[in-house]
Amino acid sequence: QLEFGLFDFRLHAEFRPDQGAKILETLAEIKKLVAVVPSPSWGRFPHAFSHICAGGYAAGYYSYLWADVLAADAFSRFEEEGIFNRETGQSFLDNILSRGGSEEPMDLFKRFRGREPQLDAMLEHYGIKG
């Protein structure tokens, strides 16, 4: 997901074909930074990656990872205070579920969590940090 999100950002923010930029070279640069598994030189993944240019995803593919950050961080409060802690559940209901789209999502998250989102819980969930 990180590779896809970075590729999406680079294409929408920096990609300049009129200045000689090439899609496969752009992806290769990103893969050097973050890829875990090498891909074959004959691969043409970008030619079929329609998400980044269709369906409202333009420069928004990162949202999959961002959703994981928010979900893991919110759940970590339950882990810290007890999965079945009534007060934690009520706070989640009051500050997230019952508010829906009536307020800015980040304001609701910060009200529930008491702080800005942090990556630690997601990294731990992925087994990257322990």
Regions found by a protein language model. Give the residues of each.
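C-terminal, non-catalytic "cap/extension" segments appended to globular domains
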Residues: Q1-G130
